[in-house]
Amino acid sequence: MVLSVPVIALGATLGTATSILALCGVTCLCRHMHPKKGLLPRDREPDPEKARPGVLQAAQQFNIKKSTEPVQPRPLLKFPDIYGPRPAVTAPEVINYADYTLETTEESAAPASPQAQSDSRLKRQVTEELSIRPQNGVVEDVCVMETWNPEKAASWNQAPKLHFRLDYDQKKAELFVTSLEAVTSDHEGGCDCYIQGSVAVKTGSVEAQTALKKRQLHTTWEEGLALPLGEEELPTATLTLTLRTCDRFSRHSVIGELRLGLDGASVPLGAAQWGELKTTAKEPSAGAGEVLLSISYLPAANRLLVVLIKAKNLHSNQSKELLGKDVSVKVTLKHQAQKLKKKQTKRAKHKINPVWNEMIMFELPDDLLRASSVELEVLGQGEEGPSCELGHCSLGLHASGSERSHWEEMLKNPRRQIAMWHQLHL
């Protein structure tokens, strides 16, 4: 028998409704038998003492009592006693100033209570200072000097000394100066020093010098000096050892020199000894100022480069008349006594310290370099009239002092710019 669709739908609906009703009945029966197990924690009856405040819970009322009794503040913290070092009081005789006395700014007060004593101890650590008050009411500068050292003070006035040893080689016909040491009273920062030795005989003189060393109170050279000298010229020869300095501007100065006779009586050969250098008093310069220039030689191109940098302390009899006028430098290249070529720098306004920064180039073969020289003339010229010479100097092996040493340094160091200051002569 085939059932129709409406009958099947009606049966399904009735079955579903019956199931729902049965489930509801079972649920009610369970709640009736166990009423507390089916409730959530928030649905249970809360303990009034342990109840948590909620949104639906009634606000709790507090009883507030007003009182007019004064409120006592908390007691201050009591720090333990601090025992710090007291300021060291320097005696007046140590400062060596009789008109001053040492006092402290601590105010004395009678302790009234233990609390006051504690406060005074704390205040002493902060407010106690050391002051110097004059007795006569006049405030002057007080200078506390370091402890006097007699040995150091004696070295200030001590003359420079030089240690050396002389030996003569008959086969090579040379005089050797070794074991070179120099002791000076002071040293200048940034300065180098070297020893220059020269032997003078009837036919001429020869020179040699050591390498530059950092100047110190005690300077030692590992190298020595070798001076060619014939054995027959030894009794009449005179050796001069000069201690020189060179600053960062390539300015050379003499600390002292020592002259020795090589006859064998005053200085024995083969014995090391100390000699005191004689310092000459510096006379006021009679020159017309100084000029700073650098020279270099390029062997591959056969070119001599002369760079005129600047001059300083230019003065002459006509300096007032030439003030504000033009100043230039004329450079002349000479081979022995013959003038090869001359060039002139640009003109600069006549000041005490004019600046040029100009390079002049000469073509010169390598075989003529040692016998050549460079002559400088500083010229001042007004708007009208001839130029006036303010000073001159000459560089070459024929010269002496810094002019000769500058040329020798150029020969030893090709392709290198070497700058030095040179004194101008009238």
Curated annotation (Swiss-Prot):
The keyword 4Fe-4S does not apply. GO terms for cellular component: cytoplasmic vesicle membrane; plasma membrane; transport vesicle. Residues 1-6 are vesicular. Keywords: Cytoplasmic vesicle, Membrane, Repeat, Transmembrane, Transmembrane helix. The keyword Transmembrane applies. Expressed in brain, heart, spleen, lung and testis. The chain crosses the membrane at residues 7-29. It is found in: Cytoplasmic vesicle membrane. May be involved in transport vesicle docking to the plasma membrane. Interacts with NRXN1. Belongs to the synaptotagmin family. The first C2 domain/C2A does not mediate Ca(2+)-dependent phospholipid binding. The second C2 domain/C2B domain binds phospholipids regardless of whether calcium is present. This is Synaptotagmin-13. The lineage of its organism: Eukaryota, Metazoa, Chordata, Craniata, Vertebrata.
